[in-house]
Every structure is written in structure tokens, then in C-alpha cells.
Amino acid sequence: MIAQILIADDNPDITGLLSDYLGMKSHRVIVVNDGFQLSQKASEHQPHLIITDIQMPGAYGSSAYQVLQKDPKTKNIPLIFMSAHPYEKLAKLLPNDPKTRFVQKPVDLAKLEALIKELLPLGGYVP
């Protein structure tokens, strides 16, 4: 089974880098550029994992998270939040949920890969 991962970020350099990297790891990648598309595509495709920027047009990643939690199709999808700001500055915006993690930009791909491996089983992915 190929893992399906949704990436949400308004920076095309970030989405391109992550999409290429995850594609090389044999994941199927869906890319969106704002919080509205994030909620819409997550409900439509029901990915195994979402990687989202916290601050982007349409809705902050943390606001999109709240929308995802209200939808039975998406409420159990694990998320990795990304930001250029350190975790300490954003902790109060982020949910206290065992299915969420945080990674700071610029993204350390080895750390991201470890988080993906940790979270994919929570999203129903079976290798």
C-alpha cells in the first residue's frame, strides 16, 4: 500500500521540495496552497497524513485543524505542523493531540521522515 500524504503550504519552494522528497520515498503526494483547499482536499482524498504550514492564506493550519476535527472523514488524520517560528512561540496555537507533531523550517528531512514513520500508522497506513 502506498501512503497518501497531503502537503499544505503557500510557498512553492517548500511544496516542491517536500513533494519531490516524498515522491522519491514512494509516497503519493497531494499539494494545496491554502487552508481552505487543505480542508477540502483532505475530506475528498482522506490521506494517511497531512503536513501543513501554520500560517498561510485561507486559514491558518491550526484553524484548518479545527475544521478537520469536525469532519468524521478527516478527524483521525495525523498532522505535522510546520513553521519558520520556533515551537515555543507557537505552542499555544497548536493542539494538544497525540496525532500531531511540529517541525521547524527549514525542514530537516531526516527528522521529517522519522515523524512520518511515527505518524503514518495512526492514519491507517499499513505498509
What do the predicted segments below correspond to?
Residues 11-15:
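Short acidic/polar segment at the start of the alpha1 helix of CheY-like receiver
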Residues 60-63, 85-104, 110-118:
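Alpha4 helix (beta4-alpha4-beta5 surface) of REC/receiver domains from two-component response regulators
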Residues 56:
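Receiver (REC) domain active-site loop signature in two-component systems and cognate sites
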Residues 53:
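Active-site residues of response regulator receiver
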Residues 26-33, 41:
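Short hydrophobic/Thr-rich beta-strand motif most characteristic of the beta2 strand and flanking loop
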Residues 16-24:
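Charged docking surfaces used in two-component/phosphorelay signaling
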Residues 33-37, 60-66:
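Acidic catalytic/metal-coordinating carboxylates
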